[in-house]
């Protein structure tokens, strides 16, 4: 999370943010003018490597094709969509089998899946990892926001973590 500090704090002890990025309230208010709260991605890295536009476009196109294939397979049924998930995937904090059992979706259909507000980010420190974030709507889940972490395993990209929140 990116957030400000309680009003009565002048500063915060180092490393007391529980993994969050903490800004002075004045700085957070200034930043608010330039970002869309709740949807602007924040990348933290020791170093950023910029790539030529054609390389970026090629990576983005490949990622969009991957997500589209995942979506189309999931529309055909969970047994088709499961192909895109790593065997040790965590979905909303659960392993695949546990999640599938709790959701009772193995024989249910998602129907038509709509995806909007899609963003794709390669991890700065790991070229074989990317974060895909989007809004999803289908008859089984309703309207949700999804974050998928895709990792390249050998020659194949797989979802290694998926987090969902209601909109």
Question: Where do the PLM segments sit?
Answer:
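Exported/periplasmic cell-wall-interacting domains
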Residues: 1-68
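A mature extracytoplasmic/lumenal domain signature
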Residues: 4-6, 27, 35, 46-48, ...
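Stable alpha-helical elements in mature extracytoplasmic
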Residues: 27-31, 66, 70, 82, ...
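A structural boundary/capping signal
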Residues: 52, 74, 115-118
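Short, well-ordered alpha-helical segments enriched in acidic and aromatic residues
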Residues: 76-92
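Surface-exposed, charged secondary-structure patches
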Residues: 101-149, 163
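Short, solvent-exposed coil/turn segments at beta-strand boundaries
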Residues: 126-127, 152-158
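Low-complexity, intrinsically disordered terminal/linker segments enriched in charged
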Residues: 153, 161-167
